[in-house]
Amino acid sequence: MQSHNSFSINLNQQKSLAKKRLKAIRQNDERALQQVKQFHTQPEKLTTESIQLADVQHALARELGLPSWSKLKAHVEELEFHKLAIHNREQPLDAELKTLHVRCGHDIQQQLKTCGFEGEFLPMIDPLCIGPIPNDETAFVAIRAQYVVDMLLPVMGREGSVQDIALSEQNKINTLLDEQFERIVFWVEHDTYDQFMLLRGLTLLEDTEGKVIEIIEFNQFPGTERFIGFGQLPAEAVRSCWQHRKAVTSKLRSQAKRCWQALISPTPQSLIELLTQHELDCLPNIKAAMKRHLQELPHSESGLSFTQQLALEALAEHSTPITVKDWFQEYQEKEPLPTLGDVMFYALLLPLTCSDKPLFSIDSLQKNWWEQQVCITEHAQACLEGSQPITQNYWVGGMQVRESNLWVWDHNQLSSLSHKEW
């Protein structure tokens, strides 16, 4: 029977699958052999005659995201241990200190309760991966609240005041800084949403002393589908992550501060310097996140951000309209570092419909946003080809993209990044 979760691995299933693949290979199934070779560390040595069960098991473990079959077995046993601990309602893992669990969303809030954690949960949901990141702390919350009201709430068909959004965010900051908590644990993945929330959180905690501050950080997890975030994981897997937390050291704080200062800079030079000249070993996923962040600057030929480019390329594959829901899913498959939720995605794309020559059409704004049908335009095709580039006005962190102050590049080589003045 198939596992209910792509990250709950059934060892007996994998043993059976390995035997079936070996049998198929022995019967000259070239496709099965190539599948094993794709993940084996020594594919050149594998032939129909020489391959052994251990080879198939080794490749299968690597396909699931583990280095060896023995590591796979250990991983499965570990998750079984945590599943039993949850079933037996063992003492909470965070019981020894009054703990605040910080996350950039609500996805694991219930899971933490299921796992038996007793600490409080703080969702810091302001998506710093999109919109302006102000360098003025006194105006930071208000500016971000204005962006949420202007760009995100309309997509959802919701109304809200800047004051209410700002108050909610300030209350979250107050909770983060609350002296009652003896330990703060950040749960983060490798994308820009999580990484920038972490930088923001550590910046806010810069003067905090006498607390344990820790990070649980993952960029992959063994399973049969692509790992995007903790929300995909079963409860026992979430519980197992606890043992991998790391302490926030003075060195990590220093690196985080440097990254934050680069992020709020009005030009990209500081980010480029960080990426090319500095070791950021305490923040293993920040460089990839920073580069992906820079890819939101316009492409030198099309004028599109990388998100817009990928989205329009996905839409260009369809000759008939598709729903926004399907469009987002297809974009996600192309995205090398999935970050955006569906609302954020659509908010970044909608401005492309507001010019004299829209890049995609919408059948009806009266529908729920995820049911709206979208279709690419001829102008978008020309834009993607570079023959009709567009100019836009938007924010990428501390950088304002506008025609009079334009940073563009090929979204590949940082050395191609250049400044255009009109």
Map each language-model feature to its residues.
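Short, conserved secondary-structure transition motifs
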Residues: 215-243
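C-terminal engagement modules used by replication, chromatin/transcription, nuclear envelope/ESCRT
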Residues: 355-422
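Charge-enriched amphipathic alpha-helical scaffolds
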Residues: 309, 332-364
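Long, hydrophobic/aromatic-enriched structural stretches that serve as scaffold segments
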Residues: 155-207
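A conserved mid-domain beta-alpha-beta active-site/ligand-binding segment of alpha/beta enzyme cores
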Residues: 235-316
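Intrinsically disordered, low-complexity eukaryotic regions enriched in glycine, serine
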Residues: 1-84
